Every structure is written in structure tokens, then in C-alpha cells.
Amino acid sequence: MITKKIFFILLFAITSILSQTYFPDYGNWKRKKPNQVGFNQKKLNKAIQYAIDSESSGSRNLTEFIKATLTKEPHGEIIGPTKDRGDMTGLIIKNGFIVSEWGDINRVDMTFSISKTYLSTVIGVALDKGLIQNVNDKVQIYVPTEHFESEHNSKITWDHLLRQTSHWKGTLWDKPDWADRPPKNVAWTELQNQPMHEPGKNWKYNDVRVNLLAFSGLQVWRKPLPQVLKENIMDPIGASNTWRWHGYE
């Protein structure tokens, strides 16, 4: 009898918690006033104004902006689509409820490095589904291409690529690893001879190596990574269908 009572109380508690949990319907997010979810309206307004006033001073024409940013980088050609950015836009959500918004929240804008989140997620799903057995496995086991044939590159694991500690050496899609964010005041002819660290020993932000992770993930999945993201993440969570994840052209 005591066991039954405990079970009933526990079940009642779980049911009560679930009944209080709000999850927005597809395309129909409910709204609440800031003070209803614990925000101080004056402080929130100040934060929103700060966000609006902090707009980048760079050109809204992102083709021009990217070219200006990469002027000092060899092989800085744009090889993917761009889209002009719009007015400053934001959305504040608390507990699943929209509490504030500004600008055109339905506009689709470029988000740049958030694609790294997408990329690490689809690699994680590959691990979950057994397509990758262990993040500490050598990538060469799964991707037997020239990209991982050298003595140095053959040591690289999935973990190294995910953490940007691989120090992979090579050229991918006509862009050599040394050309991304090169050190200042170093002649281009000297960049190719920069010291190389053992995989896993040193962190370095490098988009060529991030793209190598995308290439490697593509070899494992054997289908477009945006499709993988859509089927395994975006559709199940009820995301809109207006997002795009473009590869290189």
C-alpha cells in the first residue's frame, strides 16, 4: 500500500510538472509581457536599445564587407553565396514565450559561424547513430583520402577537428591551410613554413580545417549535411523551413 501511495504521489508530481511545461506549436509562439517572466522592463528596454545601437559599422553589402575583411589574406576569394543584411533585429525568448522583439524577425539573414554549431551537431548525430564509433578514432579510418595520408595528418582524430586542434596541413577546395588568418607582418612566401604543432596540442581557429570537418562528415553520411540537419534536428524540433545552409559554389 505504501509503495502504491509513493508511486501515485511521484506520478502526480511528474504529471503536474509536465502540465506546466510549455512548448510552442510550429509557427505559433505565444507571447508574455516581460514582467510576467521576471524581467525588469526598464532594464530590458535599455539592453534592447544597446543592441540596436551596437550595429556593425561595416557595409550592409556583405560581398563588399567580406572582401574588405579579407584583403590581407591570400586566397580570400568568396566561393559561396552572400546576402545583404537588413536592419538590426532581435528576439528575446524566456521559457518558450516571446517577451520582446525588434526589427523584421521574419527576415532571413546570414549568420556565419553558427554553421559550426550545425556542423558539430551533425557529427554528433553520426556518432549517436554509430556511423562514427568514437571521437578519438583517427579520421583516416573513415575518410581514406589523400587529405589524411601524410604522417602528420594521419594522426588527426575527430576530436581534434571538432576542437580545432588538428593543425591539419594541406589544401582544400583550392584554399591552403596557411592562408586562413595568417599572422601579421609575415610575407606570404614565408607563411607556408610556419611551425606545425602535433594534432591535439595547440588550438588555432582556421576555417580551412573547419571545412575539412565538413568534408569528412560528408564522407561518413554520404548525403548533403543540410539534409542530415533537416531530417535529424530541424524537423523534429519544429523549426521553420526558411533556413538555409549553403555550401561552396
Model-found features: residue ranges?
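N-terminal secretory signal peptides that target proteins for export/translocation
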Residues: 1-3
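N-terminal leader/targeting segments and the immediately adjacent pre-domain N-terminus
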Residues: 17-104, 129-132
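Soluble non-cytosolic domains of exported or imported proteins
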Residues: 34, 38-45, 87, 113, ...
